[in-house]
Amino acid sequence: RSRHLSEHSRSLDALLDFYLGSLHAVDRAQREFEAAAGDLLDPAGELAAAASQARRAYRRLADQVQGLFLRHLARSGWPPAGRLANADLFDRLVAPRLSESGRRVALLLIDALRYELWLALHTHLVGAGHAGAEIQPAFAQLPTITPVGMASLLPGAGQALRLLRRNDQMTPALGEQVLTSVTQRMAVLRARCRPP
């Protein structure tokens, strides 16, 4: 995939499309390799050198992609124009389904779920009979720290999410409501998603 990277590096959109289309498979392969290596390889054995070489190749590619991403991010800003931002995800995709009479909605709020892991989870959900499970890439709120990322998935985040600096830390708030804990975030969901 490294040799194809230059073909998809001209813009942020091209790089994102490359990741969504095929580059994510490299992350999946690395995750699966590490799981297998942990189970099978003798750290001092004959395969240790090959495992180290595979890890170095993955790291080189990841570093190249990250460098390109950061350069494009500095030029283009974030979130990418014309793409779904996490902060708009609830209001655009979840809320309309919640308003449908009789519609059951499962909302999974999972911290640090990489795209390639969602694809694997999606495959399992569909295989388990949940044919309505959907894949809709959405782009994280920066900075990608847990409190900010999880707050960005709440109802109204696209319009009301703010980042406050408190005690030398970034603290998310929806309007005036500071959100520093799971309990506070769940209270927002309960208040805004309660059936009439």
Regions found by a protein language model. Name each.
Residues 1-105, 112-196:
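…; additionally, a secondary subgroup of soluble metalloenzymes is captured
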